[in-house]
């Protein structure tokens, strides 16, 4: 039943998907351009650490936005499956499988953004490191997360 209604009118699903994609794009631009773009100083671990420490709440909001972006990927993946299933159920399942893996990997990778907060708080056990070493370690975690790690 649902199958035939999708074949007749996929516009509703496509519009919902479009709204989800717009939200994903806005959240991605916010996290990348506004948060990391203003707080991460390319090539300068100490300046980056100082900027994150000074704007910790902005950094946390950026992480939350990034994770929300990946949560919104889940209904988008379901919508893509629903829209593509009438064309080829096998390919729709394959696309769903790969999209779910991509989302899981990206969401797990975004957790690296929490590491600078932990390193800069200097929680127990980090006393052996100098502040410069902690700044370098936190910057390294950011490079693991970033697509711009080709510096």
Regions found by a protein language model. Give the residues of each.
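Membrane-interface interhelical connector segments
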Residues: 115-143
């Amino acid at each position: 039943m649902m199958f035939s209604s999708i074949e007749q009118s996929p516009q509703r699903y496509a519009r919902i998907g479009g709204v989800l994609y717009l939200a994903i794009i806005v959240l991605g631009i916010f996290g990348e351009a506004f948060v990391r773009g203003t707080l991460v100083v390319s090539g300068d671990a100490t300046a980056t650490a100082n900027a994150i420490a000074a704007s910790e709440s902005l950094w946390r909001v950026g992480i939350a936005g990034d994770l929300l972006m990946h949560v919104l990927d889940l209904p988008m993946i379901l919508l893509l499956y629903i829209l593509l299933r009438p064309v080829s159920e096998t390919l729709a399942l394959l696309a769903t499988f790969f999209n779910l893996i991509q989302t899981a990997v990206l969401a797990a990778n975004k957790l690296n953004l929490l590491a600078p907060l932990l390193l800069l708080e200097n929680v127990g056990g980090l006393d052996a490191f100098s502040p410069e070493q902690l700044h370098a370690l936190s910057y390294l975690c950011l490079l693991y997360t970033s697509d711009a790690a080709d510096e």
